[in-house]
Amino acid sequence: MSLSRRRFIQASGLALCAGGLPLQARASGAQAVLPVPPLLESRRGQPLFLSLERTHWAFMGGRKVGTWGVNGVYLGPTVRVHSGDDVKLIYSNRLSESVAMEVAGLLVPGPLAGGPARQMSPGVDWSPVLPIRQAAATLWYHADTPRHMAPQVYSGLAGLWLVEDQYSKNAPLPNHYGVDDFPLILQDKRLDNFGVPEYDPPSSGGFLGDTLLVNGVQDPYVEVSRGWVRLRLLNASNARRYLLQLSDGRPFFVIASDQGLLPAPLQADTLPLAPGERREVLIDMSKGEEISITAGEAAGIMDRLRGLFEPSSMLVSTRVLTLRPTGLLPLMTDTLPARLAADPLPEGDVVNNRSIMLGSASSPGINGALWDPGRIDVQARQGTWERWTVRADTPQSFYIQGAQFLVKSVNNAPPLVEDRGWKDSVWVDGEVSLLVYFPQPSSEHFPFLFYSGTLELADRGSVGQMVVQPAQ
């Protein structure tokens, strides 16, 4: 059959375009090994140092490019602290612009919570002493600089922060960091042909990249022992929500959410992960079969070709991580504990009901008002409970600093099973009802913040301020 001139040109053009695809869109070579961030553990009497600085990192192809990071690496070390300790933390800003930092999910008084009120100019340090008085949980630290949070987090100012307590130390769960207990920080970026991250914030809504990174690399693998493997998942993307699943269809065993362990392990076939959310899961590798975690549907060839001429929001590859079991099955394999949390989830009497309306992609703000550092939007009382009804026409994540909450309903239906524990971040697509508890006080000079987890919307004003009066 003859080939017409037009069809020949079309076919030739597709072949040429495919040959000129960005490196991340072509078939890759050997998979990268999962980088495990170094562990920075608190020791009594010794401060923790977090230096915010320029560094270099190879996002693809082994070629290092300039970026930001903490303590010399893209993203930062995993900090591990222990409940009951008082931890001296020293942030050092070695960058050329001002930065504010926050440990999202850390329950400390307002003056110690970081954020805009603790902004550091270039060359300046901030040294809070943090009383760690909460249950074991996977938290994260990140830039929280007014109107610059999105580009600074995107550039690499983020990392995991683990709280351990006596119960978590003794629980029959994998806890050997980097061996059977792995941090996974998910981000989406746009990389040019040389592997340099590009950031061009959209005029409305949040930034969506086309390249999925895990701990700073694409499509990594990790070798694990045959047995239970624990994954601590963090969505550190600016706006993208992920829907995770396992390649062979088996369920995740979910053991923890933002603010700590669930009452008992739960099974979930798919696992949503909104910006700022953390979840901990267990995967049974005892059968000795390789398995992958995926995050939705990847872009097809035509979508990749369009990406040559215009920014794409579809991920080139959606494979998060491949787990490769090695060695023999241990002589003894632990079964899942029937109970996880040391204490049942309490509930108290609601003293106030609030309605929170999050701004849209084109019209940011909260309850119709843009962030004003001189205005207090919410007055609450330490040790009390409130019901917050949060609404959004534009789907987005929502975070409350200095508080913890239980999700009571989502669009008038029961919440997902994996959302039954203590949380500080939640996906809002319509309406969610939250039972909010305030364990720590704040003040007008050092208020807590609540804001959109779509970081570009937060930078444009989708932020509110809250004073929690000390308990009487």
From Swiss-Prot:
PTM notes: Predicted to be exported by the Tat system. The position of the signal peptide cleavage has not been experimentally proven.
Gene Ontology molecular-function annotations: copper ion binding; oxidoreductase activity
NCBIfam families referenced in this protein's UniProt entry, alphabetically: PRK10883.1
Signal sequence segment: 1-32
Protein name according to UniProt: Cell division protein FtsP
InterPro entries listed in its UniProt record: Cu-oxidase-like_N, Cu-oxidase_C, Cu-oxidase_fam, Cupredoxin, FtsP, TAT_signal
Function in brief: Cell division protein that is required for growth during stress conditions. May be involved in protecting or stabilizing the divisomal assembly under conditions of stress.
An annotated GO cellular component: outer membrane-bounded periplasmic space
One GO biological process term: FtsZ-dependent cytokinesis
Cross-referenced PANTHER family: BILIRUBIN OXIDASE, CUPREDOXIN SUPERFAMILY PROTEIN
Family: Belongs to the FtsP family.
Predominant subcellular localization, coarse grouping: periplasm
PROSITE patterns: TAT
The species this protein was found in: Edwardsiella tarda (strain FL6-60)
Keywords: Cell cycle, Cell division, Periplasm, Signal
Pfam families named among the record's database cross-references: Cu-oxidase_2 (PF07731), Cu-oxidase_3 (PF07732)
Subcellular location: Periplasm
